């Protein structure tokens, strides 16, 4: 039996599920994903359009399959659908032991709906159901963005008995709406006769992008007080989100009534945890966000940083809400418009994924054209 890295094992023991924010066929074929499971405590995988775009643009791993699809006359969308769902299905199969050992809580792989549908409720619902059927694995998560149009889609998809990873959450206010959408979906699933214990969900709360946007604005203000607040907003925001999570899933009658029928909590998932500012510790968004019943999905670079020098000191979130609120009060007092910050981040988040999707379309089209020659 291969030994787990002690730092990552300590993180897991503190209640944080370690997920890898990356997937490629090379990673699957080389056994690297299995190696990360065996040595770095990885118990889940998240993907997004940027990750697939990167996977397809590097090397020739997908050439043979794309040539075969081209010969069958597959168009670009069908090709992307086949290639990405094949990888996700394979990753689901690799993670079955973790799924079984955790009673379905971990061992999860996430695939995102087409980001061009971020503002279209009905089409999002339709595609989520299609992806669920195509991958056909019980340990799949369908990723749906927490846009205004995404919220009713989240409820509708959960009501079908499908597990959902809600993505692109930036503000605590929107996170509360996400938890409400989860509870609504579970209530509908109960009415439809689904087994609630089999429906799982996580809420992906983005961390580093909040610091990137707010730090930019603090630098523009330039006062000593402003500069002292740099690098604090991302962690403070996530800590306030965790306090909101506890309110709903530990104290609300609405969740209690679902729990009696087997409903699980919707766990907070810390996303965007790769540190973008070299002035900050490269494990900042891991060591400062340790709390029970959470997930931290990390790029491999961050997993390696935690493995090498991450100091895990137990729960660093519970009981921090008043200090976190103080950070936000100070940000407001010096003129940071937080409503605008979160609106910009959501719009930018959708746009980034759309841009990656368009690059993926172009690259796949080029692959198909080459194969057809």
From Swiss-Prot:
GO molecular function, a single term: transaldolase activity
UniProt keyword annotation of Nucleotide-binding present: no
Subcellular location: Cytoplasm
Keywords: Cytoplasm, Pentose shunt, Schiff base, Transferase
The EC number(s) this enzyme carries: 2.2.1.2
Keyword Aminoacyl-tRNA synthetase tagged: no
UniProt-listed SUPFAM superfamilies: Aldolase
Active site (UniProt): 143 (schiff-base intermediate with substrate)
Catalytic activity, as annotated: D-sedoheptulose 7-phosphate + D-glyceraldehyde 3-phosphate = D-erythrose 4-phosphate + beta-D-fructose 6-phosphate
Biological process annotations from GO: carbohydrate metabolic process; pentose-phosphate shunt
Role summary: Transaldolase is important for the balance of metabolites in the pentose-phosphate pathway.
Protein's name in the database: Transaldolase
Domain of life: Bacteria
Pathway note: Carbohydrate degradation; pentose phosphate pathway; D-glyceraldehyde 3-phosphate and beta-D-fructose 6-phosphate from D-ribose 5-phosphate and D-xylulose 5-phosphate (non-oxidative stage): step 2/3
């Amino acid at each position: 039996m291969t030994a787990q890295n002690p730092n990552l094992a300590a993180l897991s023991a503190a209640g944080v599920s370690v997920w890898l924010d990356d997937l490629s066929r090379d990673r699957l074929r080389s056994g690297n994903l299995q190696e990360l499971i065996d040595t770095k405590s990885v118990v889940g995988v998240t993907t997004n359009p940027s990750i697939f775009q990167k996977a397809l643009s590097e090397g020739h791993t997908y050439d043979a399959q794309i040539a075969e699809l081209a010969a069958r006359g597959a168009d670009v969308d069908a090709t992307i659908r086949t290639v990405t769902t094949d990888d996700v299905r394979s990753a689901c199969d690799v993670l079955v032991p973790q799924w079984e050992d955790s009673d379905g809580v971990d061992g999860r792989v996430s695939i995102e709906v087409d980001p061009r549908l971020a503002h279209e409720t009905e089409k999002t619902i339709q595609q989520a159901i299609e992806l669920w059927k195509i991958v056909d694995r019980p340990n799949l998560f369908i990723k749906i963005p927490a846009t205004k149009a995404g919220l009713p889609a989240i409820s509708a998809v959960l009501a079908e008995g499908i597990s959902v990873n809600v993505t692109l959450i930036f503000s605590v206010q929107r996170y509360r709406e996400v938890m409400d959408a989860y509870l609504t979906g579970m209530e509908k699933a109960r009415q439809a006769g689904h087994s609630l214990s089999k429906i799982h969900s996580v809420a992906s709360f983005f961390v580093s992008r909040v610091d990137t946007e707010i730090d930019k604005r603090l630098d523009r203000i330039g006062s000593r007080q402003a500069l002292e607040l740099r690098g604090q907003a991302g962690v403070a925001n996530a800590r306030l989100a965790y306090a909101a999570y506890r309110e709903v899933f530990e104290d609300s009658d609405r969740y209690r009534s679902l729990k009696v029928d087997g409903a699980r909590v919707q766990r907070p998932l810390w996303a965007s945890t790769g540190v973008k500012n070299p002035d900050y510790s490269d494990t900042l968004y891991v060591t400062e966000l340790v709390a029970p019943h959470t997930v931290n999905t990390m790029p491999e670079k961050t997993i390696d940083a935690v493995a090498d020098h991450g100091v895990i000191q137990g729960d660093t979130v519970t009981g921090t809400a008043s200090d976190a609120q103080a950070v936000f009060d100070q940000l407001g007092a010096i003129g940071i418009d937080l409503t605008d910050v979160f609106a910009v981040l959501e719009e930018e988040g959708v746009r980034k994924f759309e841009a990656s999707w368009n690059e993926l379309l172009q690259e796949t089209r080029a692959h198909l054209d080459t194969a057809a020659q």
